[in-house]
């Protein structure tokens, strides 16, 4: 429908709703006609009427017609609200915020275009049938599948980002535990050496020799343990660096996806919404980088 700027699928949706509205309008007009017909058959049986009788008949007819018209207007408004709710609900599933221009609802030019299209749709003898199929949920901005693929890629990157956060947290816990263990071993060695110095004047030479041998053995064992802990710490630091590189890669991919979306969504109402989502994700990544910097080894 070139005159209203809709594609074939949305044209079919529009025609279905237009037919529904026309059917409801026809039923209500028949109801109004029946009000007049009932009046003719039930009240207009006399040849002459007084002014009071005519006023009474017209007042009764006015009340009935007023009630019917009011009911139809209310029902039409509620129907439009339900239709709008469907569109908004589908948009929210794609993290979009739709905007409406109420002033366009009174645009005479557009209203005339709608009327002309309805007239052409009614009178056209070669119009294509509208297939009644099960309709999938709307996929906004799905031009050639590019935007949908970008959205899927963003979701994948978000999942990978969460996995990296979890992995980073585990590495941080392991690194903290290793540092604590190393500190405990160093303190135990210092305490043992201090205790050895305090007891040298109170033991015999033989006992001192044995104690020194024992201390040497313990020191060697402690040193070996410390070396193992140091190697473990280096491994944890390497894992931490790897996690940081992975995080930077994810950030770069998110940045590339953002640029691609900007090219795709520019000049659309959804551009600002997707930009806001990517900005939040970048802020989360910046916060994560700050947290990573706190656990990087100092020179």
UniProtKB/Swiss-Prot annotation:
A single GO cellular-component term on record: cytoplasm
Family statement: Belongs to the LZTFL1 family.
InterPro entries reported in the protein's UniProt record: LZTFL1
Coiled-coil segments: 88-296
Subcellular location per the Swiss-Prot or TrEMBL entry: Cytoplasm
Annotated spans, Interaction with BSS9: 145-299
Swiss-Prot/TrEMBL keywords: Coiled coil, Cytoplasm
GO BP terms: negative regulation of protein localization to cilium
Disulphide bridges: none
Descriptive protein name: Leucine zipper transcription factor-like protein 1
């Amino acid at each position: 429908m070139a005159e209203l700027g809709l594609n074939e699928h949305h044209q079919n949706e529009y025609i279905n709703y237009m037919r529904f509205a026309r059917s409801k309008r026809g039923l209500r007009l028949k109801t109004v006609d029946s009000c007049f017909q009932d009046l003719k058959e039930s009240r207009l049986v006399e040849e002459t009427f007084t002014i009071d009788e005519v006023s009474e008949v017209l007042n009764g007819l006015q009340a009935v017609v007023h009630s019917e018209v009011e009911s139809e207007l209310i029902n039409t408004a509620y129907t439009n609200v339900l239709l709008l709710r469907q569109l908004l609900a589908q948009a929210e599933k794609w993290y979009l915020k739709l905007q409406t221009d109420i002033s366009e609802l009174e645009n005479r030019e557009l209203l005339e275009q709608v009327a002309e299209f309805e007239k052409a749709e009614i009178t056209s003898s070669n119009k294509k049938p509208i297939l009644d199929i099960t309709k999938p949920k709307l996929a906004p901005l799905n031009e050639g599948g590019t935007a949908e693929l970008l959205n899927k890629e963003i979701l994948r990157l978000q999942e990978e980002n969460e996995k990296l956060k979890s992995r980073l947290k585990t590495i941080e816990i392991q690194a903290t535990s290793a540092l604590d263990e190393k500190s405990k071993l160093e303190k135990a060695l210092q305490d043992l050496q201090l205790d050895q110095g305090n007891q040298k004047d109170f033991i015999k030479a033989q006992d001192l020799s044995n104690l020194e041998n024992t201390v040497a053995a313990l020191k060697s064992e402690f040193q070996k343990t410390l070396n193992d802990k140091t190697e473990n710490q280096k491994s944890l630091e390497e894992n931490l660096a790897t996690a940081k590189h992975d995080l930077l890669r994810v950030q770069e991919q998110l940045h590339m996806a953002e640029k691609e979306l900007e090219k795709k969504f520019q000049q659309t109402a959804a551009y600002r919404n997707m930009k806001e989502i990517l900005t939040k994700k970048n802020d989360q990544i910046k916060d994560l980088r700050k947290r990573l910097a706190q656990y990087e080894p100092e020179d």
